[in-house]
């Protein structure tokens, strides 16, 4: 009977089980008192609690189903937003027609085809007293110069080198301009923005109008930027409005020997058999602003661009957008430098705000270490 009771899980087994449980509890206590183990466990818990995807995985199936329904709504919102931007593009086209007469008059003043009236040229500066003082000093200098040399004051036609000065003032553009580009850009008379016609795919064209010159025969050079305003089927939640997706340039009809986008190099070749040497000339690409009109093409055949090409294309898109949104509408302010000062002040404000926010975050970490604003 005793043997049967032991084999059936009698008192001896109970004692052994109790002993094992006690040992396990002691081992657990020892492990939980180890700082390294506790730190590792805490880090793991923190990572789980602060990762949104990990949190979503813990939710019941019914809740996940409702979240999927919210995503469906979000996609529909993205399509409505795309429609909104299409109508904004239509409004831009409408108001571009209202701006154009003013821009045409701007061109006439710049080129000197029309002289502004006294009423049109009247301007009251915010620093009127300083301007008056500067004007008085200037008048004294002019009078002194006239008395000394009796030279008639020059009165150039229009506003010389208006657009070229803008290129020099704006860093984004001046970085593209080489010394041999400068004489050509001095012939630039106007830059216009044209929007795509109603019902056509969204796009805009930059038109660079040149006076007759010794470099090329084109009166106008164009750059077309193609846009897309619809959510990506593969990633609809990334939609943030219209984006430039491709661009086309134009062919520049260079006059003989005037093409600044290529340079000619001479190379000597030696004949293997006869040992005679001949000199050959070869044209190779040359850095120039006018390469702007021969852009890279965005890959549309499934092949991806290399990193350098992607960067070049993105920079091109940024420049085109800057011409459209900033340079053309506010040209005179980039000529005088006032718009550049505004841009610089805005950038400094953003940096200061970022530094201040970083300081606030550090303070929050000290006061409440459990708070994570990203959760």
Curated annotation (Swiss-Prot):
Q: Which InterPro entries match?
A: NAP-like_sf, NAP_family
Q: Could you tell me the Gene Ontology terms of the biological process aspect for this record? A: nucleosome assembly
| One Gene Ontology CC term in the entry | cytoplasm
Residues bearing Phosphoserine?
A: 5, 7, 49, 53-54, 125, 304
Q: Which of the residues bear the PTM N6-acetyllysine?
A: 105, 146
This protein's superkingdom? Answer: Eukaryota
Where is it mainly found? Answer: nucleus
- MF-aspect GO terms: nucleosome binding
Chain residue ranges for the region called Disordered: 1-28, 339-375
Give residues where N-acetylalanine occurs: 2
Residues that bear Phosphothreonine: 51, 58
Q: Motif Nuclear localization signal, which positions?
A: 265-271
Q: Keywords for this entry?
A: Acetylation, Chaperone, Cytoplasm, Nucleus, Phosphoprotein
Q: Where in the cell is it found?
A: Nucleus; Cytoplasm
Instruction: Tell me how the protein is altered or processed after translation.
Output: Polyglutamylated and polyglycylated. These 2 modifications occur exclusively on glutamate residues and result in either polyglutamate or polyglycine chains on the gamma-carboxyl group. Both modifications can coexist on the same protein on adjacent residues, and lowering polyglycylation levels increases polyglutamylation, and reciprocally. Polyglutamylated by TTLL4. Phosphorylated at the G0/G1 boundary but it is not phosphorylated in S-phase. Phosphorylated protein remains in the cytoplasm in a complex with histones during the G0/G1 transition, whereas dephosphorylation triggers its transport into the nucleus at the G1/S-boundary.
Assembly information from the UniProt record: Interacts with core (H2A, H2B, H3, H4) and linker (H1) histones.
As for what it does, the entry says:
Acts as a histone chaperone in nucleosome assembly. In condensing spermatids, mediates the loading of the heterodimer composed of histones H2AB1 and H2BC1/TH2B onto the nucleosomes, thereby promoting the replacement of histones to protamine in male germ cells.
Q: What is the designated name of this protein?
A: Nucleosome assembly protein 1-like 4
Q: Which organism is it from?
A: Mus musculus (Mouse)
